[in-house]
Amino acid sequence: RQDDGHIYWVNAFQNSYGENRSTTHNDEAFWIQVKVLEWGGYPKIETLDQYYDLLERYADANPTTEDGAKVIPYTMLCEDWRYFCIENAPQFLDGYPNDGSVIVDTDTMKIVDYNTTPTAKMYFNKLNEEYNKGYIDPEFATQTYDEYIAKLSTGAVLGMCDQWWDFAYTVNDVFKQTGLDLKGCNYVPLGLTAKEGMDNMWHTYADTLNNSSGLAITKSCEDVDAAFQFVNDILEQDIHDLRFWGVEGEDYLVDDDGLYYR
């Protein structure tokens, strides 16, 4: 604990150098199946209303899957700490990145609880509307995480809001094993906003500050400076390359544009 009464910790999740070239959105988004986009002619979807309109129209035209299972236009997960699948959406709809529990307005340097905004009211009203029309999974409030993953894995769920890492490792593997990936069941992320034409920061190339956890140095640490230096060093590019790529010239090559390849 410092003299000001606070305990500080280090956000050591990642450090980006240069241009991020990742192609996977390993974060939160509204997701939709490829086959739904294809059916709709790959429309431009900017808003929540446009998103649900496409889900509704597809479900009305295709009420069952190829094997006869009932299509679930939209489901939500709210078991335990995973309630973020429902609760986080207003900050994205207002055009902000995932800054944790609040919206940070960098112009006014004010923070706002995104559950108290007009956009949040619009969002939850929309969920109620879709639920009452029968387009939201009636089991969403009671289903467990395992039940949620099982539903997604059948290919019957057209859309949801979730973190990629929360479902993709399991669901994508099942799709590959069952051939559902070839039938357009894979999920595509969408950066929705409350209104058309708004700027959005839903995809931040994994550079979103995570202020909910981190590394702290205990008071029994004999060399605090060395401990922090170690944390700093393991985030260096050389360590990243060695861990994920290997030895340059032996395990991978780098082209003239700085792109790594094997």
Task: Label every PLM stretch briefly.
Residues 1-262:
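Extracytoplasmic/secretory soluble proteins
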